[in-house]
Amino acid sequence: MFTPLNAAELSDLVRSTVAEGAALALHSGNSLSALGHPPRGDRPHHSLSLAGFDTIIAYEPDELVLTVGPGIPMAEVKSLLVERGQHLAFEPPDWGPLYGQPAGIGTLGGTLGAALAGSRRVTAGSARDHMLGFHAVNGRGEIFKAGGRVVKNVTGYDLPKLVTGAFGTLVALTEVTVKVVPAPETVETLMLPRLNPALATKLMSQALGSPHDVGSAAYLPASVARDLIPGTSDSATLIRLEGFAASVEARAAALMADLGVAVERLGAGVSRTLWQALSDAAPLVGLHEDCLWRISVPPTEGAAILEAVQAARPLATGWLDWGGGLIWLALPAHPGEGDGGAAFLRGLVKNGHATLIRAPERVRTAVPVFQPMPPALAALARRLKASFDPHAVFNPSRLGA
């Protein structure tokens, strides 16, 4: 495994790998190594760890900007921000345990590379929206930078968005700059019990569209709710409010009056644990034999898909987040089906993306892990890859063909 400690070493490594005709499998914390397609073909693949780029380069709390190496653990980032009453608004999840890894080993670089975001993404935006700039080495071994360290900077602004979510297929990051924001003083969750997915989606949409500054909304079937919420045995529709205590109290009272249904309040302690568990997909961690899927759709379509899955696969585990726009699913093995449920699920998803988050390697080798792109978009993606990495040295198989 190669572990360069600076951009010059990384540049030399990329150039020598290109000359060898080999490829580099990028990672930092290695918590997400089983997400995506495994390496393919006879081409040699060398492991490239960016864990050596793990320093805090600049933190300017008053400017709401943090610059660090991509190998810095997310746990260290969160601890640093908590000291100044700040956080990353897109709520980075910890998916390591989904892959049998210890909690807390994920890095900021891995989080940005996979564009991971938690339940608050529906209102706060994605990881891509909080990435301001980066330094990197491209597939030619050239050192370059894009974006900057100020929130209003626009120079090279599109490149940070392109790199975020590229799964290390375009560049090898050496430095990242992200936007941080003040953390809320407190949190409250309104729980609406015993609703079906369709009515839950309607009320989540009402809450998210209200003037009460709702932060996130999710629907949990009874099988999921009872494992996460003490004393609950029915389905739970959850609406999160955050901010100053007096504001949260006033908004909670107003929203409860507007919704016109039975509402229970969970309190700050339960709320913090609950929303972290949903962001981390914690209810699926122990389902080791199931294939895990994450489906992004228009919020109005999530309930129907979840109900269709529940009807056809009664042993499946799943819930709605992002106000109905995100579906988490765990599918047990199905007789005569070797694709982890890909054909079944993608047949249900007409306007969205179904991503195979976890499956055995044989399934990830045979099935598109990521939603297949339309031909024109796939051609654009190939041109983008060629412009950054003409020799396909970085994670050439990670996103598929």
Segments predicted by a language model, with ranges:
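C-terminal substrate-binding/cap subdomain adjacent to the FAD-binding core in PCMH-type
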Residues: L132-E289
